[in-house]
Swiss-Prot record:
Keywords: Endoplasmic reticulum, Glycoprotein, Signal. Interacts with PLOD1, P3H3 and PPIB. Identified in a complex with PLOD1 and P3H3. The lineage of its organism: Eukaryota, Metazoa, Chordata, Craniata, Vertebrata. Residues 81-100, 387-443 are annotated as: Disordered. It comes from Mus musculus (Mouse). One of its GO terms (biological process) is bone remodeling. Residues 387-419, 434-443 have a biased composition (Acidic residues). Disruption phenotype: No visible phenotype at birth. Mice are born at the expected Mendelian rate. Two and six month old mutant mice display a decreased ratio between trabecular bone volume and tissue volume in tibia and femur, plus decreased connectivity density in femur and tibia. Osteoblast number is not affected, while osteoclast numbers are increased, suggesting that increased bone resorption is the cause for the low bone mass phenotype. Lysine hydroxylation of skin and bone collagen alpha chains is strongly reduced. In contrast, prolyl 3-hydroxylation is not affected. The gene is P3h4. Glycans are attached at residue 367. This is Endoplasmic reticulum protein SC65. The keyword Cell inner membrane does not apply.
């Protein structure tokens, strides 16, 4: 459909609230549906023309459309990723032989049979969802949304439209993924100074559900409420694993084909692009606390659980949490000592060999992330030069075209509050000897 027709369609769109209000990827309003590239392109045109309210309106609409596409992709790929139905297995090769070539031929047929089954499933699924009824956006545009670039324009558009509360939320949302972007940090401090907003009122519009639960668990941990802390930390861990699986599934969406290649190199190109997206899931889902990303986020949750369970006298869970942590940081001397301590007193607590094994979800996550990185390293090492594979690097973010002048920061409102949360602490056990802790009393 031509841009003019889409423009007429959007005349029907009422004033948008928060971009995710009343959202459903199954029942997305038909009057709000249009190509992501069209919505975003129009938003930037309005931005350049200083039509701030119209620009903000289309930027918010584009963010909703991006979420619609992301969630729809994840839904279909998750629902089509189950085990393949049984395929007839040839007893021998095409010439009746049973040698290695025949086995390779049979294995390849089964593999492509599974691929065809999955493709058919995806086609059926996507026919029913609104996101796939409009043209698919370019790859670079999706990367811009992943890096939260639209919020860099949105906060300034809201500011110029005199919507300071929304400007604060948009600027803060951008900084949560780009904490070192000094210009946006300056904007945010300026907005906060005008409204006298504290840290507790800042909202990340793209925050994942596990982030707030994790932060609450850490606060409870630091206050000594270990039981409530473990409950929240377990919930945060489970929610993170769910979001991580959804992110992996979403990486198998449509891909651009920019040139002609032989069959297997073409498949390798598509696979490498999907691999890069899946490896990036771990980074993109890492929470930002006070301007700093939580290093080894999953391992950190197991670290908190290990010490909290120990304080609750649940040594079996403490030992399993320690073993899970060691998957991600096997050289941590403190955790090594903790495991030695648990093993030394295993008879006292009735611990068995299986109590020193990593938890199932930790093992699965570790194996997934490790194998994905190994495969991606392989593509960089062996395929990029030989097959001229284009593994593009993420481009640096452009600045908004209309920066604030120095005069707009003069006088009242020029605040430089730090965003670092004072309560953030590492687990107390880290850096301490396990034997230095008092032994829990058995009841």
């Amino acid at each position: 459909m031509a841009r003019g027709a889409w423009g007429l369609l959007w005349l029907l769109l009422g004033s948008a609230g928060a971009q995710y209000e009343k959202y459903s990827f199954r029942g997305f309003p038909p009057e709000d549906l249009m190509p992501l590239a069209t919505a975003y392109g129009h938003a930037l045109e309005q931005y350049e023309g200083e039509s701030w309210r119209e620009s903000a309106r289309y930027l918010e609409a584009a963010l909703r459309l991006h979420r619609l596409l992301r969630d729809s992709e994840a839904f279909c790929h998750a629902n089509c990723s189950g085990p393949a139905t049984s395929q007839p297995r040839p007893a021998s090769g095409p010439d009746g032989d049973h040698d290695g070539d025949g086995e390779d031929w049979a294995r390849e047929l089964r593999l492509f049979g599974h691929v065809l089954e999955r493709a058919a499933c995806l086609r059926r699924c996507k026919k029913t969802l609104p996101a796939f009824q409009v043209p698919y956006p370019p790859r670079q545009l999706l990367r811009d949304f992943q890096s939260r670039l639209p919020y860099q324009y949105l906060h300034y558009a809201h500011f110029k439209a005199n919507r300071l509360e929304k400007a604060v939320a948009a600027a803060y949302t951008f900084l949560q993924r780009n904490p070192k972007h000094e210009l946006t940090a300056k904007y945010l401090n300026y907005y906060r100074g005008m409204l006298d907003i504290g840290d507790e009122s800042l909202t990340d519009l793209e925050a994942q559900p596990y982030e707030a639960v994790f932060l609450r668990a850490v606060k409870l941990y630091n206050s000594g409420d270990f039981r409530s802390s473990t409950e929240d930390m377990e919930r945060a861990l489970a929610e993170y694993m769910t979001v991580f699986a959804r992110c992996l599934a979403g990486c198998e969406g449509a891909h651009e084909q920019v040139d002609f290649k032989d069959f297997y190199p073409a498949i390798a190109d598509l696979f490498a692009e999907s691999l890069q997206c899946k490896v990036d899931c771990e980074t993109n889902l890492t929470p930002n606390v006070g301007g700093f990303f939580v290093d080894k986020f999953v391992a950190t949750m197991y670290h908190y659980l290990q010490f909290a369970y120990y304080k609750l006298n649940d040594v079996r869970q403490a030992a399993r949490s320690a073993a899970s942590y060691m998957l991600f940081d096997p050289k941590d001397s403190v955790m090594q000592q903790n495991l030695v301590y648990y093993r030394f007193h295993r008879a006292r607590w009735g611990l068995e060999d299986e109590d020193f094994q990593p938890r199932e979800e930790a093992m699965l996550y570790h194996n997934q992330t490790s194998e994905l990185r190994e495969l991606l390293d392989f593509t960089h090492m062996y395929l990029q030069s030989d097959d001229e594979m284009e593994l593009e690097e993420t481009e640096s973010l452009p600045e908004p075209e209309e920066p604030l002048s120095d005069a707009e920061f003069e006088g009242e409102g020029d605040y430089e509050e730090g965003l670092y949360a004072d309560w953030w602490q590492e687990p107390e056990a880290k850096g301490d000897e396990a034997e230095a802790e008092p032994e829990p009393e058995l009841t």
